[in-house]
Amino acid sequence: MKFMVTEQKTLIYPVINLITGQHNYIGFKCRISTNNANYVVHRVFSIQNKLSREHTASTKTKSQVRGGGKKPWKQKGTGRARAGSIRSPLWRGGGVVFGPKPKNVFFKINKKEIRLALYTVLSNALPKTTVVSSLEGLPNFISTQALIKFLRSLNVSLDNRVLIVVEKKETPLFLSCRNIKNLALIQADHLNVKSVILAQSLVVTLQALKIIYKTFNDN
């Protein structure tokens, strides 16, 4: 385990009020990694990838393959190599030796490491983060076009990967996002390192931002 050096940093976010068009500012104090930022972020990112895999690959051993109970030919006198079953691993259609089986994989990672990695990537993502006071400009019904228009008003390009972070996934918003290729929607308390790293633009509501720093607080 590498020795971590952290420092307390205040992240200042400009908040866009969509109704008045004014800009306010809000700041949050957090601890970020200084000397081993790449190490801790890579560790959390790779473990998250491993835990997201479903180890469902499965093969059958000789005893599990159907058939093969009868000896193919007698033990001696044929001139052939001796054989006891047509389901031997040496035969086509036979069992598999040491093949994959479904398994449960667990990798332990400390909560402090997750928090440190998340705050570090959020700090690096500050230039590409847009904070809005609310999503009041969006209709209460399913409308992909309205969502695209809303994002364009924030100068967010849908040619890149966009991540919208909200305090709660509302059904109309979720269904509106589903039809846009490079757009993902995530709830604030489910935010993770991988989502932030892969996104090239972040759109966060003010309430969601408060939930993020409350959920992953140092205390």
From Swiss-Prot:
It is found in: Plastid, Chloroplast. GO terms for molecular function: rRNA binding; structural constituent of ribosome. Part of the 50S ribosomal subunit. Probably binds the 23S rRNA. Residues 53-81 are annotated as: Disordered. Keywords: Chloroplast, Plastid, Ribonucleoprotein, Ribosomal protein, RNA-binding, rRNA-binding. Residues 68-79 have a biased composition (Basic residues). GO terms for biological process: translation. It comes from the Eukaryota. Belongs to the universal ribosomal protein uL4 family. GO terms for cellular component: chloroplast; ribonucleoprotein complex; ribosome. The lineage of its organism: Eukaryota, Rhodophyta, Bangiophyceae, Cyanidiales, Cyanidiaceae. The gene is rpl4. This is Large ribosomal subunit protein uL4c. PANTHER family: 50S RIBOSOMAL PROTEIN L4 (PTHR10746), LARGE RIBOSOMAL SUBUNIT PROTEIN UL4C (PTHR10746:SF17).
